[in-house]
Amino acid sequence: MIQITVVQIDNYGPWTVTPNPRRESDLQALQSRLYCDMNLQFGAHRGLAFYTRFDNIIAITNGIDLETHKRIQNSVKNRYPFTVSMAVASAETAYGAQKLATKTIQEYGSAQDDVRKEVLDVANEFVSNGYVQLAHVDINDITGKLTDLETAYDTYLSVQKTKLKLMEELKKYDSLGFFIGGDNFMCPCNGMSEKDFLCMFEDIKESCGIELKAGIGIGKTAEDASDLADIGLEVIREGKTDFQVYTLKQDVEERKDVTYNYMCPI
């Protein structure tokens, strides 16, 4: 089981234009700061957050309890000109968990409802013995094939096309995909096999002309899984395997449960 938290800014759209439209550079900086904070605060408890649309953030939160969520929510209220609502859900797949979390938060009203404020709800249960599977995907030789040859914008466009195709293919497996900078994507993919990734990469190569590779990490928390995925990708980059997908799995005895009672200082 994987645990997902959906974080949504309360009544954000109307706030950005009340009493008058706010300066765009300030809004962009504010959204970026919230994303940074969510990664620092969930990350302090071995979670991992993805910006999606910035006003909606998806976090992998295996091992993070309700009290910690509440403290993060209060921290936002104390330091930002808006509040956030959160819904937590767990499922066998990442897509299933975020779907349930999204439905839970939607039951409290519209994202632009000025009455709905600081929702914090759990759709089913907190995960105690689940696991997180993450794939760190990147483009083969983007520097030589795109960065050093094409314009910055054309390279960006190629990466975005690849991202969209990757996300669409991952959804077929009830998995998610997020752009994490450069030519890198992080993909919560509980239940997918190496064969699934190889087939998916072949389809993307045929449709986009882009070759991909992936390190897959399986661990108790998002931090554990992402660390292993990063190592797996380095194994491929360094030519230590002939395959374009490499999986590493955490030893179940390697990390004991730790109860966190601190917050990451911002």
From Swiss-Prot:
The keyword Cytoplasm does not apply. GO terms for molecular function: GTP binding; GTP cyclohydrolase IIa activity. The keyword Nucleotidyltransferase does not apply. It catalyses: GTP + 3 H2O = 2-amino-5-formylamino-6-(5-phospho-D-ribosylamino)pyrimidin-4(3H)-one + 2 phosphate + 2 H(+). Its EC number is 3.5.4.29. GO terms for biological process: biosynthetic process. Pfam families: GCH_III (PF05165). Keywords: GTP-binding, Hydrolase, Nucleotide-binding. Catalyzes the formation of 2-amino-5-formylamino-6-ribofuranosylamino-4(3H)-pyrimidinone ribonucleotide monophosphate and inorganic phosphate from GTP. Also has an independent pyrophosphate phosphohydrolase activity. PANTHER family: GTP CYCLOHYDROLASE III. Belongs to the archaeal-type GTP cyclohydrolase family. This is GTP cyclohydrolase III. The lineage of its organism: Archaea, Methanobacteriati, Methanobacteriota, Methanomada group, Methanococci. The gene is gch3.
